Amino acid sequence: MTSNERHRLSLIIATLGPSTDNEKELITMLMAGIARQWTEGVDIAGVLHSDGEETAKNRIELFREQSKKRNLSTSIYLDTDGSDMDKYIAFGNEISPEIMSFDISNGLDFFKTIKSKLEDNIKICVRVKLGTSTEGLDDFFRECDYSMIELDSKVIHDEKIVMRSKDNSCEPIYLALMPTLMKGQVQSREENFEIGHTLEEGFDLIALYQETSHGPYAARSVKCIDEISVESEKLRVNPFQDMLDKFFSFFKKK
């Protein structure tokens, strides 16, 4: 599927976990509901190495298997909450994700050398957690292909985080939070507004974490982000066509 054929231009990363170990839920996320009730499904699966190597490998294999079975071109975003970088790097080289994330706390020198330790096809992402100082972020952006932005929406706006990341050829990813969907099927208007408003800063990739990995309504969470993204794109003057064309070309989307 090319970007010209998509109704939603933004790409969605859904983190896999116990909730998506239910194969039916995983398939619903991939296929955008039953018989594609909404526009597009999940583009990229987030997988945590720190959940255990066997667990992570099983989730990746199942996601790739279901994607291939349905002729869907999807990708893997590998992350970890662990501290053993040697094991994490070895696992990444074994399963070859398209994107591999590392926490900013590893330090700038780490990011300057990490590419030489990974397979050539793996793209590097710096994870910027909530509360991280925005000083010196540009140095990290310059070393990476992607940035996972978990900062407060006001900080993202005031500190021009999206522009700074893109100016350094580092594509920013927005971690959307919908805590109400951890309890029920209807997200709050306040959450919708904050996510939509933040996407208008220029994010072209949106990630979900707990909502899809542990939440009771994983597929519903993806559907909500899909709807918010579509509405947000209508308000943007230039819907990032060039970036998407490059992205789809890199991952060989059809």
What would you call each of these model-derived segments?
Residues 1-254:
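Non-catalytic helical/linker scaffolds that mediate oligomerization, partner binding
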